[in-house]
């Protein structure tokens, strides 16, 4: 007998004709007491009491927020999602309300396309042909292959792929496969991330860390300048940044200037001024602003003398060449002899010189100024240089380490100190960049420290032979140059085993050899920490909303079973004799030691969330350094802000770099490859940049129908460029370059600079990879490059040149 749920009945469409039929049937029933409706049993069942419950959980995808969810459950199914309803919702102790992604989470949980059983690949990688197997066969296959590869190639041949589909949890997290591998000798690890590879590398040389003031500190500023920062789409929820920016600006009435190729949602209706800029040229703008600040005597010279190295001749390191300091570079007195004037920058950025002068004077006269940058500008082929150049504006004006100022990077967050599931120490010290794993599969033994950024040794001894792919669409969808990656993964004699653990048959899952069905975090117990939470830290104790359906299992159980098969010592080291529930209680207790006012475990199951305010009201990056640089030096060789980096000068002299790959000891502007002035523009005249789309978090939520309908996947194109190509809004267009091509709808809009196009990253690949390979899903990585950036060896996924044609 088919069971109809209340929700299904509510969704059913009722036409006038069907309503009349039902009414007639009802009249007939009244006329005959012997008549029994065929659905009368269902009606009686519906009248019977059904047990309902509500549990606290969280949305834990990689948006930088961790929003509280109240999941209402009936018949072991989530049928209604609330968000944070706790407290009085006063700013500073506000409710952590989810955005539309988190509020649609029941559609992910109840999605018919979720993985249900363990499977093994029976076709080619990427075909998506699998057959169902038992858990024992799956776990035995994984364990046998892992044991064989460790024996034949060593631990350096195993890699855990970057993945953030399950990111904010504690035990529902990539820490679990890390811990397993560290329990059995270690693995080839990585440095950097697809989010922040270039800026994290660059700031480590400049400040010794990548840290900024919390966004609530905008309440203390006079001016907000955002370079490529778009929290209204990337971190738009109550657990994110947009609410803080709005509330803080209400208190300070700060003027806000947005610098971005797109008129993004953060700008829309909120900004005082939008300055559209060519992608990848923010560094040139920053240098021209610096020229105005220096020539008009608006720099904070005492700050530069006391806290910095390399601004001028006085603080230039003794081993540096003469006139190698920043001031000389800006004024044209350095080796290149080019003054970085507003007129020079106007030709590069497309921002008029008079606008640059006006902006510079605003920055120089606003005391303090909150200068920040999102992670978009650094995700270019010159991203390391760009991020340092922007940060220099905060340094020049003395806005570092003070209330209302910032270090020039993305806004930071106070951390209350959640105890994390320990990964254990990795005995293997060799590392590769997060972005170069395809090279490590394809030609790993050719990768060196000076050409490919290998760390821990001069070169890799073995290629990657075993790949863990947990909650990761990076295997194909989120990695640069999909066509190249497809070719690398086709040869299964290179990477001999790929284990996927996921919720859906994503584009990446189709390339796995063994595929395991994971429970979602909302179906498990976990201790979840805030991330982009401003000055209000919080922790969520999530409880499972429903039972495990079909043969889905939690990752901790899966890897405990693998550990058991690898031997009793591995199993004991991995589990320490604890179940997942026991780990959560342990981690809660350790967190409570740091925060005694946090509710105990049983009480927190009821309250769901614990919130705590930053004791200093606002989090200020590098405050201690500013107050006493001798007692609190930065983690740089000099202990100061290194405007001139001797370490970068040495790297520039010793690394193997191509002509268009520049590492500079100063925060100088460098064009980068595949940029606005690349000769390739003669063939592919339009710059293409990516952006984080509000319908998805990377590729998470990319298969939710209501979000797809609300936010269709489109390529943004300016009316001038569209008219030249005969393109109208809504037309299907062909976007292509040497890397690949896609068919996608055109969004013709003046909200993007002429000569520039944009596609929201994270859309699911829909291409016949064994046919024409034309993508119909709008995955930007069919067009991006797998060539890494010079210093961080990170993903330059916003540096692209394309042509667009009407289909």
Curated annotation (Swiss-Prot):
SMART domains: Molybdop_Fe4S4
CDD domains reported in the protein's UniProt record: MopB_CT_DmsA-EC, MopB_DmsA-EC
Domain of life from the UniProt record: Bacteria
Keyword Ribonucleoprotein assigned: no
Keyword Glycosyltransferase recorded: no
Cofactor(s) listed in the protein's UniProt record: [4Fe-4S] cluster; Mo-bis(molybdopterin guanine dinucleotide)
UniProt xrefs under InterPro entries: Anaer_DMSO_reductase, Asp_de-COase-like_dom_sf, DMSO_reductase_YnfF, MoPterin_dinucl-bd_dom, Mopterin_OxRdtase, Mopterin_OxRdtase_4Fe-4S_dom, Mopterin_OxRdtase_prok_CS, MopterinOxRdtase_cofactor_BS
Keywords, ordered alphabetically: 4Fe-4S, Cell membrane, Iron, Iron-sulfur, Membrane, Metal-binding, Molybdenum, Oxidoreductase, Signal
Cellular localisation: Cell membrane
NCBIfam families (alphabetical): dmsA_ynfE, selenate_YnfF
Name used for this protein in its record: Probable dimethyl sulfoxide reductase chain YnfF
Organism: Escherichia coli (strain K12)
